[in-house]
A protein has these predicted regions:
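Short beta-alpha connecting loops at secondary-structure transitions
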Residues: 88, 124-128, 167, 208-209, ...
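Active-site-adjacent bridging/hinge elements
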Residues: 76-82, 195-203, 242-248
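Accessory "access/gating" subregions that flank catalytic or transport cores
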Residues: 112-233
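C-terminal catalytic subdomain
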Residues: 215-265
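Active-site cavity-forming subdomains of large catalytic enzyme subunits
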Residues: 1-129
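An acidic intrinsically disordered interaction segment
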Residues: 2, 48-60, 180-195, 233, ...
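Acidic, glycine-rich active-site loops and adjacent beta-strand->loop/helix elements
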Residues: 12, 24-26, 30, 204, ...
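A short glycine/serine-rich beta->alpha loop
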Residues: 17-26, 68, 206-215, 252-261
Length: 265
């Protein structure tokens, strides 16, 4: 019903937030438990947060003059028996992942400057002979970020940098490709029908299937977690190089190391 969708929008636009618990669903049969908590207030049952307080849903409906929605055929299944909750969490994580990937490049570029690193591993020619899209994008991003840097352009005595600097295009690039893949899975999912059974009126058929199963998302989320963890791993190794007293930098990046702790911890 249009009123069902409208009431969901009314809740959101008026900061009426249903209380949803973070335990209770496996995702193997849809997000039954969290979605039940999310949509109970539509029918005047359950609890919500409103004006910073936990309230009974029916009292908030009364305050706004809203009648509890009377669900029609199959609306309950459509609201509860799907992957909306895990999809929403995934979209939130994806937005953060895109931002973290960009910030990882910015931080790594500054680290490369501080470590007196070479720009050679970021040149386009070396990316093109192993043309993974994320790797190419990372090389281009670093060339733009470091263009005109006197530290980068000055003469280097060392022939090459440690892996954690030299392999940034490959590692950051692989994470970019992983994020892009997971985003494609999510985009498909949030534009899909995931309840059950599914009605095909044009064919006069009702089919009990398994579109409620969260496996496509679960595998993708594990992939995303691995990819983001790699950004953290390689960043930690660069930090280690920066604080070891190499290339003219003081130990722990502080004057009088030993007396002063600096970035020891």
């Amino acid at each position: 019903q249009v009123i069902t969708v409208q009431r969901i929008l009314d809740f959101f636009n008026n900061d009426v937030m249903p209380i949803v618990y973070d335990r209770g669903s496996l995702g193997a049969s849809g997000d039954l438990a969290p979605l039940a908590n999310l949509f109970l207030p539509l029918i005047g049952v359950g609890d919500v947060y409103y004006k910073g307080k936990k309230c009974e849903a029916i009292s908030v409906l009364d305050e706004f003059g809203w009648e509890p929605v009377k669900l029609m055929s199959k609306e309950g299944l459509a609201l509860l028996n799907g992957t909306q909750f895990m999809s929403a969490n995934g979209v939130f994580a994806m937005l953060k992942a895109f931002r973290l990937s960009k910030k990882a490049d910015l931080i790594a570029a500054l680290s490369l400057e501080a470590f007196d690193g070479r720009i050679d591993p970021f040149m386009d020619c070396i990316q093109q002979i192993r043309p993974h899209q994320g790797q190419i994008e990372t090389g281009e991003a670093f060339r733009k970020l470091l263009a005109g840097s006197e530290l980068i352009e000055r003469h280097k005595d060392h022939v090459q940098d440690p892996y954690s600097f030299r392999c940034i295009p490959q590692v950051h690039g692989a994470t970019k490709d992983a994020i892009r893949y997971v985003a494609s899975v999510l985009l498909t999912e949030i534009n899909s029908v995931t309840d059950n059974p599914t009605i095909f009126p044009d064919e006069d058929r009702i089919i009990s299937g398994g579109n409620f199963h969260g496996q496509p998302l679960a595998i993708s989320y594990d992939f995303l977690a691995i990819a983001l963890a790699e950004l953290g791993n390689i960043s930690e190794r660069r930090v280690s190089q920066l604080i070891m007293g190499l290339r003219g930098l003081p130990e722990f990046l502080v004057a009088n190391p030993g007396l002063n702790s600096g970035f020891m911890i």
